[in-house]
């Protein structure tokens, strides 16, 4: 789409949608300065956010880009985030688990969480990504390049084992592949089914945590998603295991209409339930495993809040 003038798309997309209104148009662009033109004038429903979010996340996974740059990513597409198609793999890019990229599919988990939950836009998962496809074959035209071919008569090994002769089950998968797929399933279902993610507000809390000794802004990234009476505190960890004490500013409470208190929270990926304090006066505490993420869902209701302790002062009055 990038090499075709936007005037053509303005005409073509409108003409197609007059007859087929449900058709979605996705553009592959490599210049963020023309994103808005191709959305508002050209009429594209979604844009591959390759040169913005994908490139940054790849760099973070490979430890040569700071996680703090994620803030710049959402700021670049502020107001059009719902039109961004986020992804970590596609037919052009190298597989995350390949030797040419990260060499380990687990390293994708924090990037997966960010890519799937940073905005209300869609997330694309490519064939076998959720199984940690390693692209170890040298397939004719493509050769051994960290990609799975789309040019040759070939099949993707991990997907072939998942298909299992039409059974579509875990019988031929390794334990590692099963665990990875389960994590993808939980994150993607949360992105689809949790209103705070699929349609909610976003608040980046990194600006008050850059000097936080419990959080490394180069390897961890924290933010909030909020809808109605539910808030999700998300921490993506691209580094070693961390015990983070995250500052949440009063501004977040004002903008998102949060009510401070101690609540029973559910961690979406693990299913664990713990009491968590949500307050501008005390840090939000969470442990995050290495190369993983924590997604704490809190229902902001009085029934969920811990009861306040009764005062020990009885019968007092001002004089």
Outline where the language-model segments fall:
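C-terminal beta-strand-rich structural cap/linker in extracellular carbohydrate-active enzymes
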Residues: 276-315
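Flexible, glycine-rich phosphate/dinucleotide-binding loops
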Residues: 32-34, 242, 272-274
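Non-Sec secretion/translocation targeting segments of pathogen effectors
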Residues: 317-319
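Solvent-exposed beta-strand/loop surfaces of large extracellular or lumenal domains
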Residues: 262-281
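Alpha-amylase-like alpha-glycosidases and glucanotransferases acting on alpha-linked glucans and related
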Residues: 1-122, 127, 131, 137-138, ...
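Active-site proximal loops enriched in glycine and acidic residues that flank catalytic Cys/His/Asp
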Residues: 1, 27-29, 127-129, 235-238, ...
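Helix N-terminus capping/helix-initiation residues
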Residues: 49, 66, 174, 249-251, ...
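Loop/helix patches that line or flank the sugar-binding groove of alpha-linked glycan CAZymes
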Residues: 78-81, 90, 95-262, 290, ...
């Amino acid at each position: 789409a990038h090499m075709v003038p936007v005037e053509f798309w303005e005409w073509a997309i409108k003409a197609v949608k007059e007859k087929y209104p449900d058709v979605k148009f996705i553009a592959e662009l490599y210049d963020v300065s023309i994103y808005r033109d191709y959305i508002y004038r050209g009429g594209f429903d979604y844009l591959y956010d390759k040169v913005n979010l994908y490139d940054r996340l790849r760099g973070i996974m490979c430890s040569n880009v700071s996680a703090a740059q994620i803030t710049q990513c959402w700021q670049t597409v502020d107001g059009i985030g719902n039109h961004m198609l986020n992804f970590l793999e596609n037919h052009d890019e190298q597989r995350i688990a390949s030797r040419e990229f990260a060499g380990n599919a687990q390293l994708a988990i924090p990037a997966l969480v960010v890519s799937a939950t940073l905005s209300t836009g869609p997330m694309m998962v490519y064939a076998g990504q959720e199984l940690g496809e390693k692209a170890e074959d040298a397939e004719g035209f493509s050769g051994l390049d960290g990609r799975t071919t789309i040019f040759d008569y070939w099949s993707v090994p991990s997907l072939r084992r998942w298909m299992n002769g039409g059974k579509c089950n875990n019988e031929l998968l390794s334990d590692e592949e099963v665990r990875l797929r389960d994590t993808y399933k939980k994150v993607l279902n949360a992105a689809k089914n949790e209103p705070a993610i699929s349609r909610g507000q976003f608040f980046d809390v990194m600006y008050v945590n850059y000097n936080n000794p419990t959080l490394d802004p180069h390897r961890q990234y924290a933010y909030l998603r909020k809808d109605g009476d539910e808030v999700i505190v998300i921490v993506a960890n691209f580094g070693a295991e961390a015990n983070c004490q995250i500052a949440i500013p009063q501004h977040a409470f004002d903008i998102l209409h949060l009510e401070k208190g101690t609540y029973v929270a559910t961690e979406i990926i693990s299913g664990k339930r713990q009491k968590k304090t949500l307050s501008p006066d005390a840090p939000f505490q969470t442990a995050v495993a290495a190369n993983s993420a924590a997604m704490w869902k809190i229902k902001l209701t009085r029934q969920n809040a811990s009861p306040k302790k009764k005062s020990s002062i009885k019968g007092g009055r001002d004089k």
